UniProtKB/Swiss-Prot annotation:
Organism: Bacillus anthracis
Stated name of the protein: Chromosomal replication initiator protein DnaA
HAMAP family membership: DnaA_bact (MF_00377)
Region spans: Domain I, interacts with DnaA modulators: 1-92
CDD domains: AAA (cd00009), Bac_DnaA_C (cd06571)
InterPro entries: AAA+_ATPase, Chromosome_initiator_DnaA, Chromosome_initiator_DnaA-like, Chromosome_initiator_DnaA_CS, DnaA_C, DnaA_dom, DnaA_N_dom, DnaA_N_sf
Keywords, alphabetical: ATP-binding, Cytoplasm, DNA replication, DNA-binding, Lipid-binding, Nucleotide-binding
One of the GO BP terms on file: DNA replication initiation
Subcellular location: Cytoplasm
Subunit structure: Oligomerizes as a right-handed, spiral filament on DNA at oriC.
Keyword Translocase part of the UniProt annotation: no
Disulphide bridges, residue numbers: none
Length: 446
């Protein structure tokens, strides 16, 4: 085999013949080869749940398949993209190219092939960060330098950094693009001092066109590494080279960060990414399902999106978990199956938190209204009145603001929510039939 990607693709073709189609689509199709070191093949799984399942159910089969292909007994190790980003990849040496010096190039596979601008789902929480990243990719060091992206875990910071790298390389194959974590920068710096190779280290990172450095907050408290990165930053900035930095917090909130570094991080543009709203979460799930060739009912994606609102990584992991559970018990995917599949990761110990989705579903069950009709523009009484009841209950049973409730009902104005609440409140004082129906809905929600 010419390289590990070819080897793994050949292995996948063989594995596809040995397992059921749902199992292959769920567990194996989305894996990629990471590296091959000392007879250990490292495979990247899309998330922690898939990694754990592959380790416990497919390691032996994969090892046997690779033995048939290579005649070598390879150990198998699984990782997830987050840990992949922090490890150095050893690839078979590429063929020499006289027109291009690869000595300062990061191997192409260090940039996750799935993290591009095309695969990034844009929503209200990341729209500005996406626009800034695209501007930087289109004109390195001419738009915002540095670009500082911050936000919580699993919200897409690393995705945008990889997307910048891919875009730059695609439009300028000779560009020297380096992506690494601040932890890897620290470790390499320490090793360079130990091995008396400080000059080589500086040349490596001060002679690039684009430096993408992830999780810069881990430089906090590391005085010598901060000193080195300060000079690296200056060298690149003075040569008009692009610097992109990510963190879990803005520069001013990183503890024990030198003021001179903090001020340099603030030279360019600082943008944040916030957790995705409901519509964005649904769009993310749809894109993930399409990319993986999965046919997922809309009600299931709506259920998952309502239950998992923390970050994209957990959201996609929940989808894979539902698909896997469906495959294992050989049943079609629906909302009830999704609830069963996710019961272990959705805590039940605390008091039940009722969501607007829960209310819409309960009202829909009682009044025979489809979930999508609550967001639609339909004004027929058979839809409009149940919608008003759902708005009333959303105001009574959730902590959501008026604009948020309106947003969940198709982007309606907050005054519409107020009107619905006042109308239903007034009717409930005299309409016994409505009282019974609302009581029935409340029983469903308990």
């Amino acid at each position: 085999m010419e390289n590990i990607s070819d080897l793994w693709n050949s292995a996948l073709k063989e594995l596809e013949k040995k397992v059921s189609k749902p199992s292959y689509e769920t567990w194996l199709k989305s894996t990629t080869a990471h590296n091959l070191k000392k007879d250990v093949l490292t495979i990247t799984a899309p998330n922690e749940f898939a990694r754990d399942w592959l380790e416990s159910h497919y390691s032996e089969l994969i090892s046997e398949t690779l033995y048939d292909l290579t005649g070598a007994k390879l150990a198998i190790r699984f990782i997830i993209p987050q840990s992949q980003a922090e490890e150095e990849i050893d690839l078979p040496p590429a063929k020499p190219n006289a027109a291009q010096d690869d000595s300062n190039h990061l191997p192409q596979s260090m940039l996750n092939p799935k993290y591009t601008f095309d695969t990034f789902v844009i929503g209200s929480g990341n729209r500005f960060a996406h626009a800034a990243s695209l501007a930087v990719a289109e004109a390195p060091a001419k738009a915002y330098n540095p670009l500082f992206i911050y936000g919580g875990v699993g919200l897409g910071k690393t995705h945008l950094m990889h997307a910048i790298g891919h875009y730059v390389i695609e439009h300028n194959p000779n560009a020297k693009v380096v992506y690494l974590s601040s932890e890897k920068f620290t470790n390499e710096f320490i090793n360079s001092i130990r091995d008396n190779k400080a000059v080589d280290f500086r040349n490596k990172y001060r002679n690039v066109d684009v430096l993408l450095i992830d999780d810069i907050q881990f430089l906090a408290g590391k005085e010598q590494t901060q000193e080195e990165f300060f000079h690296t930053f200056n060298a690149l900035h003075e040569e008009s080279k692009q610097i992109v930095i990510s963190s879990d917090r803005p520069p001013k909130e990183i503890p024990t960060l030198e003021d001179r570094l903090r001020s340099r991080f603030e030279w360019g543009l600082i943008t944040d990414i916030t957790p995705p709203d409901l519509e964005t979460r649904i769009a993310i799930l749809r894109k993930k399902a399409k990319a993986e060739g999965l046919d997922i009912p809309n009600e299931v994606m709506l259920y998952i999106a309502n239950q998992i609102d923390s970050n994209i990584r957990e959201l996609e992991g929940a989808l894979i978990r539902v698909v896997a559970y469906s495959s294992l018990i050989n049943k079609d995917i629906n909302a009830d199956l999704a609830a069963e599949a996710l019961k272990d990761i959705i805590p039940n110990s605390k008091p039940k938190i009722i969501s607007i989705y829960d209310i819409q579903k309960a009202v829909g069950d009682v009044y025979q209204v489809k979930l999508e009709d609550f967001k639609a523009k339909k004004r027929t009484k058979s839809v409009a009145f149940p919608r008003q009841i759902a708005m009333y209950l959303s105001r009574e049973l959730t902590d959501s603001s008026l604009p948020k409730i309106g947003e969940e009902f198709g982007g309606r104005d907050h005054t519409t929510v107020i009107h619905a609440h006042e109308k239903i409140s007034k009717l409930l004082k005299t309409d016994t039939q409505l009282q019974k129906q609302v009581e029935e809905i409340n029983d469903i929600l308990k």
